[in-house]
Amino acid sequence: MAKKRSKNEIDWTDEEEEIIWVSKSEIKRDSEHLKKLGAELIELTPQNLEKIPLDDDLKDAIRQAQSFKLEARRRQIQFIGKLLRNRDPEPIQEALDKVKNRHNQQQALLHKLELVRDQLVNMGDSSLEHLLTEHPQLDRQHLRNLIRGAQKEREANKPPKNYREIFQYLKTEIAE
């Protein structure tokens, strides 16, 4: 005969009745993390947002939040956090990290190109020869003309048109 249990008496050895207790603070921390994830998603461009695996409800909520200002945006971020609680945030976070890392790599490349341009204008032919050994596809004559023009503009205190053109040329030829 089965043993009767009172209402307050729980058999903790029974696996079916095992309950995992989560503290209220942990729930709040998780909720805040999801709201921050939602805020990061709102800051993305539409092209980058398409690269993130989101369902239609979440995409619509994010698009709406992008058009809101201040208090409405804050409420919408809370709503996005609520929607994220019902989904697995790991694939979304991984895709977001990939998008952000790609952006950081692009920024680092642009900074490197700026340094190369500065070296070309300041050091002249020695820097140009070094650059051409690394990137033989570059047009030597065109680069020399741009470098000379940038140096003359700097001496005459004119706007740096050739200086910018060197950067654009390097960006199109090296970055791609």
Curated annotation (Swiss-Prot):
Q: Does the keyword Transport apply?
A: no
**Record keywords, A-Z:** Cytoplasm, Ribosome biogenesis, RNA-binding, rRNA-binding
- Domain of life here? Bacteria
Query: Which GO terms fall under biological process for this protein?
Result: assembly of large subunit precursor of preribosome
Which SUPFAM superfamilies did the record assign?
Answer: PSPTO4464-like
Could you list the residue ranges forming a coiled coil in this record? none
One Pfam annotation reads: DarP
Which compartments is it annotated to reside in? Cytoplasm
Molecular functions (GO terms) = ribosome binding; rRNA binding
Q: Name one GO cellular component term.
A: cytosol
Q: Which InterPro entries match?
A: DarP, DarP_sf
Instruction: List cystine links.
Output: none
Q: Cite the PANTHER family for this sequence.
A: UPF0307 PROTEIN YJGA
Family membership, please give it. Belongs to the DarP family.
Main function = Member of a network of 50S ribosomal subunit biogenesis factors which assembles along the 30S-50S interface, preventing incorrect 23S rRNA structures from forming. Promotes peptidyl transferase center (PTC) maturation.
Which protein are we looking at? Dual-action ribosomal maturation protein DarP
Protein species of origin = Actinobacillus pleuropneumoniae serotype 5b (strain L20)
